[in-house]
Design a protein with these regions (language model features):
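Short, well-structured N-terminal submotif of metal-dependent ribonuclease cores
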Residues: 1-37
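A secondary-structure boundary/capping signal
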Residues: 7-8, 38, 109-110, 126
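Short, flexible loop segments at the rims of nucleotide/cofactor-binding pockets, characterized by
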Residues: 12-14, 54, 81-87
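Residues at secondary-structure transition points
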Residues: 20, 36, 58-61, 85, ...
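PIN-domain endoribonuclease scaffold, especially VapC-family toxins
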Residues: 26-82
Length: 142
């Protein structure tokens, strides 16, 4: 099963809108790939989902549902490499994680990460590109 990293903003977008492209990407990652997390990425997901601006749209049940889904199937790794390659240093944790997980892709909407693709053989793609890739690879009905 190929390894993939999904960033916190994609997870937040999935939580905010059921049946959206980001939610489909998250579900496909959990079903057809091995999704990887690190403690810093998990902390960012929790922080983003807990932001006050999302509280009016995200109830505690939805946050619990998304976190349970991720924690049930995602793999937790501790990166040993510390990378300083992204324009936004806060995004380097995703590069660290992708290297530790031997991921083929990072699913993100972040322009700083997307502009790096490919980086050390790792593709950066948005949720729609990832959904299309998995649909083609797994020959899923359109």
């Amino acid at each position: 099963m190929p390894n993939v990293v999904i960033d916190a903003n994609t997870v937040a977008s999935a939580a905010l809108k059921a049946e959206s492209t980001p939610e489909t990407a998250l579900l496909l990652a959990l079903l057809y790939d091995a999704m990887y997390l690190s403690e810093p990425v998990l902390a960012e997901i929790r922080e983003v989902l807990g932001r006050p601006k999302f509280r009016r749209y995200l109830g505690p049940d939805r946050i619990t549902e998304i976190m349970a889904l991720i924690l049930a199937d995602a793999h937790l790794v501790t990166p040993i490499t510390v990378v300083r390659a992204c324009r936004d240093p806060d995004d380097d944790k995703y590069l660290d994680l992708a290297l530790a997980a031997d991921a083929y892709a990072i699913v993100t909407g972040d322009h700083d990460l997307l502009s790096m693709s490919p980086w050390r053989g790792i593709r950066m793609m948005n949720a729609a590109e990832y959904v299309a890739l998995i649909a083609a690879r797994e020959q899923l009905p359109g």
